[in-house]
Amino acid sequence: MDAIRAQLDEFLGKDRNLLPKDRIKVENDFNDPDICKFFLCGLCPHELFTNANIRDLGPCSKLHDENCVKQYQNNKDKDKYDYEREWVRVIEGLISDNDKKIKRNKERLLQNPNGDANHHGGPIQQQSISQLDDEEGGLLPDKEQNSKITELDLKIQELLKKAEELGEEGQITEAQALMTEADELKNQKVELEKIEQEKNENKRMSVCEICGALLFVGDKEKRSISHLEGKKHIGFQKIREVMEEYYKSGRRANLGRTDFYNAPPPPRDSYRDDRRSSSSSYHDIDGRRDHRYGGGSRDYGGSDRRGGGNYNNGRGSSRDNYNNINNSRDYRNDHGKDYDRKRERDYYNDDDRRKRDRNY
């Protein structure tokens, strides 16, 4: 319903249900939440793969407004919206998944040049090939021979049934004539099955370099055209062409990597400084504990060096243990944070390593 509503809004406007006198001419802004940000960047993958089983993209529920595209492209501060980075992530993800599929199918065809490998690495039967073709826009095998074989099989069954009925009625001559006719049809069926089997054995398969569909090599021209006009093939060809032009423009290199290694080092945490100051004031000059911790000595018994009594009536030992545990935990946390910050700063200062990651 959302996709249908978005299409109606795109063609008729959001105020399509209002009377002409009540309609207000309002121009959409490219930053509106109901505007498709992928369309602003140049290509919406939902539009290419509608009703196609591509990572469950489905139809686009956003508006595709050409005026918003002009607004976005002419905006000097468009980079701050970060639409392009998300668009590149989605498009490159589609291409990467498709490249993996092409590589996987090629490896399986190398294992058996006749192409008998399915999605799980096992043999591809004729039925599974047809399923792949239906789903991915590949080439369907010749169904004309199969239909002839099916027709012959039905005629044979019909003749055998009539011959049996005539034999029960005592019409032996007529029954034998039908049996002879059925035997001739059986021979024709066997010949057709042999021809079909030889065709399947001689047919080699290949992988489409654009969409990854399994194809029969040297098949009929009309089937090749049907594959090239398939929705998946056209979709992947389009996004590959768009991304090739995008790479040539140099804008992809300006985006850099999206992980935290490419970000500047984070500011020093005030929490860390507070912990350091608190740890420095933990002991006074004489080595005694700070007054905030009860004024007792460092030993767990609680008596200080000047001969004072037990800390808080003998309860100092348990409190000291509790505070020591908390302090050790804080130290481990601070130490881990310091290590992470140092690792990020070292990486940020290493230009060669960052260049290698961006090229990768």
Curated annotation (Swiss-Prot):
Annotated stretches, region: Disordered: 255-360
Composition bias type Basic and acidic residues, residue spans: 269-293, 329-360
Annotated localization: Nucleus
Keywords carried by this UniProt record: Coiled coil, mRNA processing, mRNA splicing, Nucleus
Function: May play a role in RNA splicing.
The keyword Ligase is annotated on this UniProt entry: no
Coiled-coil portions: 143-206
UniProt cross-references to PANTHER family, sorted A to Z: RNA-BINDING PROTEIN LUC7-RELATED
Lineage per the UniProt record: Eukaryota, Amoebozoa, Evosea, Eumycetozoa, Dictyostelia
Source species of the chain: Dictyostelium discoideum (Social amoeba)
Pfam families cross-referenced by the UniProt entry: LUC7
Chain's gene name: crop
Bias type Low complexity, positions: 312-321
Name of the protein this chain belongs to: Luc7-like protein
GO process annotations (BP): mRNA splice site recognition; RNA splicing
